[in-house]
């Protein structure tokens, strides 16, 4: 609310960096979804390995970083809102220093999600290649793997912003709302159909 007030008072805009919205694979997915009808079944997996330094940094202090759901997951929740709309129902199935997981019912999708900084969750074939990151979204069983292609995303967001096509506060609001809920909701036992496969 304060940032909106500052915008009104100064006549200037606050822009956010929502870099997954400019990822080529995800732009193609967004276009495809725009041509399809009906709610989707989605499995979103986001593993981004972090070293021991992470556990000793300010990032594990929820008061400073917002916790794992915000620090690592905010772009992941923005992606879901951008593709499928607002969250209507939210469940948290796991919340540890290294793993968050749960279920979201969005306007256009039912989403089982998993977020971790533990590289042991990277699928074995990718780990053998030395990979410590695995980002995947499966929509009705069709996977879009988007671990690669991150090099120039920030630059592209800055380019769009300077061209007057940036992402404003309203576009970031839903992801912030969901991440805040995930920090405070009590854990719930997942039903078999709402459980992310990585939870076993």
Task: Place the predicted regions along the sequence by residue.
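Alpha-helical elements of Rossmann-like donor-binding domains used by nucleotide-donor carbohydrate transfer enzymes
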Residues: 2, 24, 28-31, 79, ...
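C-terminal helix-rich "cap/oligomerization" subdomain common to oxidoreductases
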Residues: 9, 159-200
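Beta-strand scaffold of nucleotide-dependent catalytic cores
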Residues: 41-43, 90, 111-116
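Conserved C-terminal active-site "lid" loop/helix of NAD(P)H-dependent oxidoreductases
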Residues: 153-159
